[in-house]
């Protein structure tokens, strides 16, 4: 899992059937200091996240399981919206 910031949405009318009915977001990966590290990923939203929110992203089979679509092409999913982050230093 990693922390990310929602920076946009994706609209795709032609896509794999297993993505039907999903909301797709563009998420920027964040460092431990909540600074974008330059990489982005398209993810499925399972919690109703919006632009600008800090989110928890799960990847791989855990992402598929979180959507209830175990046999889908989903590789990453937002599984939580972050309220606060505390780090040492």
UniProtKB/Swiss-Prot annotation:
InterPro entries: EutN_CcmL, EutN_CcmL_sf. Gene3D superfamilies: EutN/Ccml. It comes from the Bacteria. GO terms for cellular component: bacterial microcompartment. The keyword Transmembrane helix does not apply. Keywords: Bacterial microcompartment. Pfam families: EutN_CcmL. Residues 1-83 form the BMV domain. It is found in: Bacterial microcompartment. Homopentamer with a small central pore. Probably forms vertices in the bacterial microcompartment (BMC) predicted to be involved in glycyl radical-based 1,2-propanediol metabolism in this organism. Belongs to the CcmL/EutN family. This is Bacterial microcompartment shell vertex protein GrpN. It comes from Rhodospirillum rubrum (strain F11).
């Amino acid at each position: 899992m990693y922390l990310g910031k929602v920076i946009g949405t994706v609209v795709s009318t032609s896509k794999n059937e297993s993505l039907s009915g999903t909301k797709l977001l563009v998420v920027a990966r964040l460092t431990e200091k909540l600074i974008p590290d330059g990489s982005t990923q398209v993810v499925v939203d399972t919690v109703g996240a919006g632009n600008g929110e800090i989110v928890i992203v799960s990847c791989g089979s855990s992402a598929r399981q979180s959507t209830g679509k175990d046999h889908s092409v989903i590789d990453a999913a937002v599984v939580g919206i972050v309220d606060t982050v505390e780090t040492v230093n």
